[in-house]
Amino acid sequence: MANDLSTHAVGRGDNPALGILMMMTAIGVLSTMNVFVKHIGPDFHPMQVTFIRNFIATMIIVPFILRAGGVGILKTKRPWGHAARALGGVLGNAGFFYAFARLPLADVMVISQAVPLFATLLAVVFLNENVGWRRWSAIICGFLGVVIALDPSGTIDLASLATVFATLCWASTILLMRSLGSTESPYTIVFYYMAAGTVIAAMFMPWVWVATPIETIKLFVAAGVLGALGQYLMTFALKVAEASVVSPFNYTAIIWGICFDLVIWSIWPSWPTVIGAMFISAAGLYIFHREALLKAP
């Protein structure tokens, strides 16, 4: 799944090698979580998966908040900003979970790597951010990659469209994170994202909830623990290295997706997926490069 932390946080940059190692490990852990979600997905509504995943993640983060200073650190001046970000996260997660249950992991991961492209485009539209011709060229190249990965010569199914929608939702959470980060603490942002997301997803439960067997609950818990561990490793990576250094290693998620598809489901990536991945990765890496240059003193 696309990640919205590594695209905005800035670390101290004193140990890039360790940061890269932690980021690659984090992506591997989160990719493993996606395998559990793919296994669970066909039997449950994606909103139920989203609800349980967010609930478990909230329970995991609460002890850390209590240790860091208690409920006092959760004071916020921007509740609607947190609510909007949580809504984007819920819709994005539900879209990805729907797609994971119906598409090869690699297909979903390739399209999801367009998050930086969507985020840049949304920044232009809603934040009036200035984007030069170089980044516009990268955006066009990346969106061409998305079109190729969708394989328009065949039938574009609902799961593929759900992946694009989910990617757009995740991009919106990035912009909201950038805005909230100017006034809110990291603990506040993470807690309200998870807790409000749980509440939003819970609103759908009267219509989509089905009984969950004990064995499946174990898979949900495993997915929640892996998700929390992946986020911790990613946060650690961003503490010891600059975001511009570690963010490009998000693209290793494509490799993980291909490997899991081959080993578990014996699925080889299609040529449109491979070619689309090249376009999207090249465009995203170039945008990271340009943003690093623009931020340089």
Model-derived features: where do they sit?
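Specific transmembrane alpha-helical segments of multi-pass solute transporters/efflux pumps
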Residues: 68-107, 112, 148, 225-240
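C-terminal-most transmembrane helix of multi-pass membrane proteins
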Residues: 2-6, 255-297
